[in-house]
Amino acid sequence: MWSESRIEALTPTLAPTPTPHYERTMTGFLKVEKLAKAYQADKPVFADVSFDIAKGEFVCIIGHSGCGKTTILNVLAGLDTASSGNAFMDGREIAGPSLSRGVVFQGHALMPWLTVRQNIAFAVQSRWPDMRRADLNAHVEKFVALVGLSHAIDKKPSQLSGGMKQRVGIARAFSIQPKMLLLDEPFGALDALTRGTIQDELMSIVGQTRQTVFMITHDVDEAILLADRILLMSNGVEVDGHYKPGGIAETVINTLPRSRTRAQLHHLDGYYDLRNYIVDFLVSRATAH
């Protein structure tokens, strides 16, 4: 099947695993060790969550609402703390927010009184307070252009559509050149056409920058399109009077060619096998066992 733990069971009809576009390491650029979070001592939302992400790797996490995906992302962002366990990035333990990690949430979180240029410049100046004005403007304009918003650079958020606001958020996150990008369902509130367009832009930027990305999504096709690996997360469940916390149940390797596009995705050999495997997990196996 598709999980790393069951890779030996791959059938001959499935697409062969291509050479990854990143170099995998034993330690990982990001390392999560036995992470757990409990709001009630006897019922942790998740427990024993461990995974690595290699530098330049794009990893998506999928699971039902309430399983703890956003909590994990918030711990990685330094916005929340785990009940137990540790998370390390580039050899250092994560302890609080840092400009080395860019975060994009489902809501755009732009300052409404500032223009697109000023919103992004504010972030850039936080990272490089001594940057000259000319260099600052050039830097901001570069990342605004990457998301196709040069024509709207001097507009305020109230003058932008929802999709344009999300593009600004993505440009702002990339503009501080973080070591890692954390995305919490960044396209979840957008219509299908806008979502597809921004997915294309994200793939292009990630390809240019070789950015390391950890992304939450509920969209199976989105995960297959974007990710090198997909973490499948289970919900906690009561079994025979005992509570079993959720966690990372399976890790799926995306064997489709890295050069895939939205238009060709469903034509690729192995696409439906991969999609059906993930959907089957969500329907039949997404509880702790």
Task: List the predicted regions and their residue ranges.
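Conserved signature/switch motifs of ABC ATPase nucleotide-binding domains
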Residues: K155-S158, I176
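Conserved ABC transporter NBD signature motif
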Residues: G85-P97
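Conserved ABC ATPase "signature" region
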Residues: R132-A152, S204
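Helix-to-loop junction immediately C-terminal to a conserved catalytic motif
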Residues: A77
